[in-house]
Amino acid sequence: MTGFDADDAAALIQSYVDDHGLLSFLGVSVEDASDGEMRLRIPYHEKLTNHGPGEGDVHGGIAATLIDTAGGLAVRSALPKPVAANVATIDLNVSYLRPARGDLIADASVVRVGSTVGVAEISVVTPADTADAEPTEVAVGRGSFRVFRDD
């Protein structure tokens, strides 16, 4: 159980994102947050895309940033005192599955949080084009995060 009410978690994390230079520049929004789970979105914008071959495809570094951020926040949300605690990425793996041309949505789930290290798995999708279509998975990742507890 985390140290804050689940109803307030998304608003609290959104405030953190809004105060973070890079994350606010990217337009990151918190769609869902709970104990050990996180859903973040980055809206599509041409300033975040590749030029030349593949023009219009979201740059892979944007997906990697989203994977890193969602994983770290998911691990932090699983801690007894998530507001007082902190995490730092110690290992990040990203596998790109296909080009992304649209908003990116990351779903992160904690695999395990130990006394000093937490691990999360993250999937990044682009939303479906139509109501009857499925979202398209564009990248997957796994992050290991050093945990700095205050409990």
UniProtKB/Swiss-Prot annotation:
Enzyme Commission code: 3.1.2.-
Keywords for the protein's UniProt record, in alphabetical order: Hydrolase
InterPro entries listed in its UniProt record: HotDog_dom_sf, PAAI_dom, Thioestr_dom
Enzyme class: hydrolase
TM stretches of this protein: none
A single GO molecular function term of this UniProt record: hydrolase activity
One Pfam short name: 4HBT
Family of the protein in this entry: Belongs to the thioesterase PaaI family.
PANTHER family referenced in this protein's UniProt entry, alphabetically: 1,4-DIHYDROXY-2-NAPHTHOYL-COA THIOESTERASE 1, MEDIUM_LONG-CHAIN ACYL-COA THIOESTERASE YIGI
Protein name per its UniProtKB record: Putative esterase VNG_1336C
Organism: Halobacterium salinarum (strain ATCC 700922 / JCM 11081 / NRC-1)
Taxonomic lineage of the native organism: Archaea, Methanobacteriati, Methanobacteriota, Stenosarchaea group, Halobacteria
